[in-house]
Design a protein with these regions (language model features):
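The feature captures the beta-strand-to-loop junction immediately N-terminal to the Walker
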Residues: 36-38
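Conserved ABC transporter NBD signature motif
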Residues: 58-71
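ABC-family P-loop ATPase nucleotide-binding domains
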Residues: 80-134
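A short, surface-exposed alpha-helical micro-motif characterized by mixed small hydrophobic
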Residues: 188-190
Length: 224
């Protein structure tokens, strides 16, 4: 198993409030890793540290192949924000222009499952779930090897969510590496290869999904 990225003893505080404490784990090639925990557990802060938006107070990130650099990874943030004045197809074309070797337009449209009417309407006319799906597909346009997703299925209905996970399955078969945050236990148990549970800024569980399924002592529960 190839370790692409090693996170070692990451600590972060805001205004003397500890948000992350001694966070350590590995990101392995071709694996789908779930960071789970209640709102405020520190998941999004950790993603921000990984992509360089926030500096850790201490700790190290070993990324020898520079996969965390913007040209080698993609990021889907927790909140989708599109400019209201652009149509769906215009946003797709804009994102294609960012990359030397983007996904072909036909493949992008196939991934969105949008018809001609949806492609030519203003993006704010899409449902919340459709906007999340579009945001996800946009994160794939540059054909990244590392995909970071922060609460990707929020606002998706059951149908869109099922379709989203079918795309994740295809990405896993293509040996893409995925790190995502979630608080949907049923999703992470179904799709992830490894689950990392963060509680009050600390990792309290870091184990393979298969072992968690079969080990009663590792059963996961989240409460608000």
């Amino acid at each position: 198993m190839i370790k692409l990225i090693q996170i070692s003893n990451i600590n972060k505080s805001f205004n003397k409030r500890c948000v992350l404490k001694n966070i350590s784990f590995d990101i392995e090639q071709g694996k789908c890793i779930a960071l789970i925990g209640k709102n405020g557990a520190g998941k999004s802060t950790l993603i921000d540290i990984l992509i360089g938006n926030v500096n850790a107070n201490s700790g190290e990130i070993f990324d020898k192949d520079k996969l965390l650099q913007s040209e080698n990874r993609s990021i889907m943030f927790q909140k989708t924000m599109f400019p209201d004045q652009l149509k769906v197809i215009e946003i797709i074309n804009l994102y294609q222009s960012f990359y030397e070797n983007p996904l072909p337009l036909e493949e992008i449209i196939e991934l969105t499952k949008f018809d001609s009417s949806q492609l030519n309407q203003f993006v704010n006319k899409l449902s919340g779930g459709q906007q999340r799906l579009l945001d996800f597909v946009l994160s794939l346009i540059g054909q990244p090897q590392l995909i970071l997703l922060d609460e990707p299925t929020s606002t998706m209905d059951i149908e869109i969510r099922e379709y989203f996970w079918s795309i994740i399955e295809n990405l896993k078969e293509d040996n893409r590496t995925i790190l995502y945050t979630s608080h949907y236990i049923e999703e992470v148990e179904r799709m992830s290869d490894k689950i990392i549970l963060i509680e009050n800024g600390e990792i309290i569980l870091n184990d393979s999904t298969s072992h968690i399924r079969t080990n009663q002592q590792s059963q996961i529960t989240l409460s608000d």
